[in-house]
Amino acid sequence: MSSLENNNSSWIDWFLGIKGNQFLCRVPTDYVQDTFNQMGLEYFSEILDVILKPVIDSSSGLLYGDEKKWYGMIHARYIRSERGLIAMHRKYLRGDFGSCPNISCYRQNTLPVGLSAVWGKSTVKIHCPRCKSNFHPKSDTQLDGAMFGPSFPDIFFSMLPNLTSPLDDPRT
């Protein structure tokens, strides 16, 4: 589905289907369209038209440029919302982000983290909540770390207190 020749999908469907983008969750259209969530983002009206179209228009000239950054920054905001945390929680429980390579962490599920909230500073890493270390993901992802930000793991565990703390794991 990563080919632009498949004109039966939206830009969001196409982008989420690209190999390496499995860390991302789908940001609902109503969240994307809410002007409050767009505050501070440049070129939002033009890019919004591209990413929300029901069919990819490869003649738009914007494809896979600014809209990737724009969607990524909206994604970083969304995953801090209640609905976004629920979506990321599902992915975390399924192990979609991988597991910690540290043998003493017993394949602890990890979360994506950015080393910076500034676009273009680093690619996404995985964060182990058990050993508190960041690692390069095993997947082929080249997602920008700003799509998650440096505080996402802390926010995730503070907003989902019903999760068992990794320190309470009986394997320790």
Curated annotation (Swiss-Prot):
Any idea what this protein is called? Answer: Stellate protein CG33238
Q: Where are the transmembrane segments?
A: none
Q: Name one GO molecular function term.
A: protein kinase regulator activity
Q: Which organism is it from?
A: Drosophila melanogaster
What InterPro entries does the record point to? Casein_kin_II_reg-sub_N (IPR016149), Casein_kinase_II_beta-like (IPR035991), Casein_kinase_II_reg-sub (IPR000704)
Inducing factors: In wild-type flies, it is strongly down-regulated by double-stranded RNA (dsRNA) interference mediated by Su(Ste) transcripts. In males lacking the Y chromosome, the absence of Su(Ste) locus, relieves such down-regulation, explaining why it is strongly expressed.
List GO terms (cellular component aspect): cytoplasm; nucleus; protein kinase CK2 complex
* UniProt family annotation: Belongs to the casein kinase 2 subunit beta family.
More details: There are multiple copies of the stellate gene in fruit fly, encoding proteins that are extremely similar, which makes their individual characterization difficult. Thus, most experiments probably do not discriminate between the different members.
**Name of the gene this protein is made from:** Ste:CG33238
Domain of life, source organism: Eukaryota
- Known tissue expression: Probably not expressed in wild-type flies. In males lacking the Y chromosome, it is testis-specific and constitutes the main component of star-shaped crystals.
Question: Tell me, what does this protein do in biology?
Answer: Unknown. In males lacking the Y chromosome, its strong overexpression leads to the appearance of proteinaceous star-shaped crystals in the primary spermatocytes causing meiotic drive, possibly by interfering with normal casein kinase 2 activity.
Q: How does it assemble?
A: Interacts in vitro with the casein kinase 2 alpha subunit (CkII-alpha). The relevance of such interaction is however unclear in vivo.
